[in-house]
Regions:
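N-terminal assembly/interaction segments in proteins that build large macromolecular machines
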Residues: 2-309
Length: 309
């Protein structure tokens, strides 16, 4: 598999490893990005890859609670300018109301729902908005929590929309707890909510990486396989702390020093009740959507070639 300079740059952004080592990793793995990350880790050159995929799409990742129903939704626009207009934000907020009240099964079903305060469908309203704002707009995804207690958090004007769902006992107000957990999610972007949810395949993969790392370490290479496996198993706790929300160090150390799970239990106890983390939704604006990147040099070369004909 061939790879490009952009692939080398992306691997560097994911791993914080130098360009030349990233190039070697891609050469050794035939351009496979995931295998290249593992190759660098096994050589001791990189830690687990950051979730640093370039996000270029504009719009808003939004979360709210409507009549007790938690809603997270992402709506994309062509430019950041359009996303910051009152008209666009009103659209997003009303779409969240539709999701909460009409419970559409998917995006297509949402488009067919009646828009609040009108007899028009969501599709018809969006067509009007496209004409008035002058940009294409798309509903990308949404989710809802109709049960338990939901707490919403929107970071930096809609770059992150986080919805946390909690089981609350004792009649306490868990809003602050939920908000602090949501801020943790936005800041640390955990891959899993709890270590019990990590697929066995991922656990096995991490074990293999740790064993390979020891095989490449002159001080560890000669140790028996069973010893390496025990050491690797011990390192899984570090993996869980890096990747699992409830096992992560709570970022607000001014409030609590320990894990997120410990913070939730401690904060609830101080309020005279009990709170259990149930689920969460974390939308990052434009996550996974790649905009076309213009190659200015290639564009100029093409224009010169065209002019020469």
């Amino acid at each position: 598999m061939a790879f490009t300079a952009q692939d080398v740059k992306k691997l560097r952004e994911m791993t914080n490893v130098g360009m030349m080592d990233c190039k070697k990793a891609l050469q050794a793995t035939d351009g496979d990005m995931d295998k290249a990350v593992d190759w660098l880790r096994e050589k001791g050159l990189a830690k687990a890859a950051k979730k640093a995929d370039r996000v270029a799409a504009e719009g808003v990742a939004y979360a709210t609670v409507v009549d007790g129903v938690g809603v997270a939704i992402e709506v994309n626009s062509e430019t950041d300018f359009a996303a910051k207009t009152d008209a666009f934000m009103d659209l997003v907020k009303n779409l969240a109301v539709v999701v909460a009240q009409q419970n559409p099964a998917d995006v297509e079903a949402l488009k067919a729902c009646t828009y609040p305060g009108t007899q028009l469908t969501v599709t018809e309203i969006m067509q009007e908005k496209v004409m008035s704002i002058g940009e294409n707009m798309q509903i990308r995804r949404f989710a809802r929590f109709p049960e338990n207690t939901s707490v919403a958090y929107v970071h930096a004007g809609g770059t992150h929309g986080v919805l946390v769902n909690l089981a609350v006992e004792g009649g306490i107000d868990a809003t602050e707890i939920g908000k602090n957990v949501a801020m943790q999610i936005a800041a640390m972007n955990p891959k899993y909510w709890d270590k019990s949810l990590v697929p066995q395949a991922d656990v096995d993969h991490e074990m293999q990486v740790q064993v390979a790392l020891m095989d490449n370490d002159p001080k560890m290479a000669s140790k028996p396989a069973q010893v390496k496996e025990k050491i690797a198993a011990g390192k899984l706790n570090a993996f869980f702390k890096d990747n699992c929300l409830l096992q992560q160090e709570f970022v607000r150390s001014d409030l609590f020093q320990g894990s997120v799970e410990g913070y939730i239990a401690d904060a609830a106890k101080k309020l005279g009740g009990k709170v259990t983390f149930v689920d969460a939704i974390h939308y990052v604006k434009g996550e996974g959507i790649e905009k076309k990147t213009d190659d200015f040099a290639a564009e100029v070369a093409a224009q010169i070639a065209g002019a020469a004909k």
